Amino acid sequence: DLGEPDAYVRLRELVEPAAARMNAQVIWVMGNHDERSDYSRLLFDEESHAPQDRVYDINGLRIISVDTTVPGYHHGEVTDDQLDWLADVLSSPAPHGTLLAVHHPPIPTPLLEAMGMLELFDQHKLAAVLEGSDVRGILAGHLHYSTHSTFAGIPVSVASATCYTLDLSAEDRLLSGVDFGQSVNIVHVYDKQLVHSIVPIGATTEVSGFPAGAWAQIEAMTPEERIETFSKKSSSFNSAEVSSNG
């Protein structure tokens, strides 16, 4: 939470080898606990105090990271200069469209009114830039809980957190960070669709399931056989799953 220099060093040591094993591009996005000077120096080997806005191309899918942070504050803003830059980038569509990555999600927070004080300010200015563009989705964080909405007609997906999450049911607290429900979001990009999956992290207890080896059995079947085996409630395959789990 303090944007300490050593945290960026350790972050690269953890993330970059994992990304290399997956042949994945790492895209960093500034958050309200980051400090621009250390962020740019230790993650990008650059000396800068400017907003950390960047453009990436992943096989024709454009990903734009926009720095919504305000130095010294927790709420978010996008300056007029940043908006002009973003409008210029979006003036030319990408082959597979664009994903916009920001920290502060441009959506309401009805279950936590306090977070409204820390939201992205002047959202109408960003909406004016995005309307009619090729932006297919907006990816965000900041809230420490998962939620979804739309903004300027664009789907918005907010990832929770891998540290602490906010308890949306804590009526006797202004905000309550808890050690529970941590997760990551995985986004699958198709030609005409985005699929957002919330994947819990940490220990869980299985209450129902099939062994991994069952997939080989299903793969060998025809489409019709798969329906009769996996979809039919009374099939021996499903009966075995029910009996083996109680």
Label the predicted regions.
Residues L2-D6, R10, N32-Y39, P71-H74, ...:
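Active-site environment of divalent metal-dependent phosphoester hydrolases
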Residues T68-T69, P110-A114, L168-E171:
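Short acidic, glycine/proline-rich loop/turn micro-motifs
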Residues V158, T165-G177:
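Short, surface-exposed loop/helix-turn segments at secondary-structure junctions
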